Amino acid sequence: MANHIAINKAEIRTLIPHSGLMCLLDEVVQWDDRSIACVSNTHRDPANPLRRFGCLSAVHAFEYGAQAAAIHGGLRARAAGTIAPLGYLAALRNGRLHVTRLDYIHLPLQISATRLYGEGANTVYEFILSAATVLVAEGRVTVVQRA
């Protein structure tokens, strides 16, 4: 993976439609044309908008993976001198959760996503969430361009 300059949360917000607290990823640490590596501590934030009754279910790990894919699409478009078309999450496949709750994890989440195929907003990504050496979640998302 190529080492690009780290991208902070303020810049991430310019790449995806998520705003405020729904922008779940804190930093892009590396990316290249095929993949991205991000870090997040928002799973520990009591104000995380995905929490219910103070708990953050592991099912929301899939949103973290999808946001990494969206950020990657935005970075690829920007590198090509364009703006990424709006897309939506059309499918989740092979989703596996290896924990029950994200708020129990006291370490930063590491989110990696790899573009398997597709261009623009019509892409398939594989993602992995981990905390240090512990696998948290994994799956495959399909992003489709809005009509």
Regions found by a protein language model. Name each.
Residues 23-26, 90, 111-113, 139:
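Small-residue-enriched segments and motifs
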Residues 20-57:
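Catalytic strand-loop segment that frames the active site of acyl-thioester-processing enzymes
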Residues 1-11:
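Single-stranded RNA-binding regions, centering on S1/OB-family and related RNA-binding modules
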Residues 71-112:
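Hydrophobic beta-strand-centered segment that forms part of the acyl-chain substrate-binding groove
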Residues 53-72:
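Compact, glycine-rich, soluble single-domain proteins
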Residues 9-19:
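Short aromatic-glycine motifs in intrinsically disordered, low-complexity regions
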Residues 2-4, 71, 104-107, 112-147:
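HotDog/MaoC-like acyl-thioester-processing domains
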Residues 26-29, 98, 114-116, 130:
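Conserved positions in beta-strands of structured domains
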